[in-house]
Design a protein with these regions (language model features):
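Bacterial N-terminal signal peptides that target proteins for export
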Residues: 1-10
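Surface-exposed binding patches on compact interaction domains or structured appendages
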Residues: 107-131
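N-terminal signal peptide c-region/cleavage motif recognized by signal peptidases
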Residues: 15-20
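N-terminal small/polar-rich segments of proteins
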Residues: 24-106, 134-172
């Protein structure tokens, strides 16, 4: 065999080996990733106590009072008006938030009255009696409490005011 035939045979063998390696390298590979999901029960909120400001006397002077009901059922007046708090039944609004322990949530709230005459109406920031606000404790139930406030002055119509505190709870 001459050198030329040897080189051609060697080149052919080399080319065949290269094509064979390329064919093997272009094959497919695969792997698997585990998948999981945790399905939770819906978060729930239930009212357990109404929001009751009790009775107040509007100021007779030209100044206003802010009526404040705190989360511990206490009504106070601030401002320079000469209004009064009358001894009467009062209560903060109470709600139970139910969800799996450790669930974090947020709330939105709105306080309104049907009758006109009260101004600067606002719910208080929610407080809790068990655990950190917005985190359901180990029991799976968190009580949240709301007070509220509004302004009155000598022009506020004397009447019974009715309304609602609407609270929405959302998973974080």
């Amino acid at each position: 065999m001459d050198t030329r035939k040897i080189l051609i045979a060697a080149g052919s063998a080399l080319a065949f080996a290269a094509f064979a390696t390329g064919a093997l390298a272009s094959g497919s590979v695969s792997t698997t990733a585990p998948a999981s999901v945790t399905v939770l029960s819906p978060i729930n909120i239930t009212k357990t106590q109404n929001l009751v400001f009790g009775q107040v006397v509007r100021p007779s002077n030209a100044n206003a009072n802010t009526v404040i009901l705190d989360a511990n059922d206490t009504v106070t007046l601030t401002g320079t008006g000469n209004g009064l708090v009358v001894a009467s039944t009062t209560s903060s609004a109470k709600f139970d938030v139910t969800a799996p322990a450790g669930t974090t949530y947020s709330t939105t709230e709105a306080l309104s009255f049907t009758q006109t005459g009260l101004t600067n109406i606002a719910p208080s920031t929610p407080t809790t009696t068990n655990g950190s606000p917005g985190v359901v404790p180990a029991s799976g139930i968190q009580e949240i409490r709301y007070g509220g406030q509004f302004d009155i002055d000598s022009s506020t119509p004397p009447q019974t005011y009715t309304g609602a505190l609407n609270v929405t709870v959302n998973y974080n």
